[in-house]
UniProtKB/Swiss-Prot annotation:
Gene transcribed to yield this protein: blos-2
Region (Disordered): 1-24
Source species: Caenorhabditis elegans
Protein name, per record: Biogenesis of lysosome-related organelles complex 1 subunit 2
Taxonomic placement: Eukaryota, Metazoa, Ecdysozoa, Nematoda, Chromadorea
Domain of life: Eukaryota
Record field: transmembrane: none
Family recorded in the similarity comment: Belongs to the BLOC1S2 family.
Assembly notes: Component of the biogenesis of lysosome-related organelles complex-1 (BLOC-1) composed at least of blos-1, blos-2, blos-4, dsbn-1, glo-2, mutd-1 and snpn-1.
Main function: Component of the biogenesis of lysosome-related organelles complex-1 (BLOC-1) involved in gut granule biogenesis.
InterPro entries: BLOC1_su2
GO annotations of cellular component type: BLOC complex; BLOC-1 complex; BORC complex; gamma-tubulin complex
GO terms, molecular function: gamma-tubulin binding
One Gene Ontology term from the biological process aspect of the record: positive regulation of gut granule assembly
Residue ranges with Pro residues bias: 13-22
Length: 132
């Protein structure tokens, strides 16, 4: 193994000369470089357009949320107004409920009295028929 290392270190291999590029190959390489450059340029332009679209969508969404916030604030204000009106009407609504309950009880009492009157009329009719 020492022999191999000695040979490798003592002699240097000849450096091959690089052949001059053939004009056709040079033209193909330049063409490829141009096409790759155009490809990357279009990729970058596409990415930039996508970012611009995302930015526009983001701004539109942000504006939509601002608009929705304004609408929600208006609805909340109107709801507060309606709640205040309801609170002002609550005593009257309680009176209406009380009158409704009284009316229901009067209707029940009327039904009982009508049954009683019907029974009395039937008894009176029976008594009159027996006396004849």
């Amino acid at each position: 193994m020492a022999e191999i290392n000695e040979r490798a270190s003592t002699s240097s291999p000849p450096v091959p000369s690089t052949p001059a590029p053939v004009p056709h190959i040079r033209q193909l390489a330049d063409n490829m470089t141009d096409k790759v450059g155009q490809f990357f340029q279009h990729q970058l332009e596409g990415s930039i357009e996508e970012y611009k679209l995302l930015e526009t969508m983001n701004n539109t969404t942000a504006q939509r949320y601002v608009d929705m916030k304004v609408v929600a604030e208006k609805v909340a204000g109107k709801l507060d107004n309606l709640n205040q009106k309801y609170e002002n009407l609550r005593p009257y609504l309680s009176q209406i409920d009380a009158m409704d309950e009284s009316t229901r009880r009067l209707e029940e009492a009327t039904a009982v009295l009508e049954n009683y009157v019907t029974q009395l009329e039937s008894k009176l009719t029976n008594i009159q028929q027996q006396s004849q």
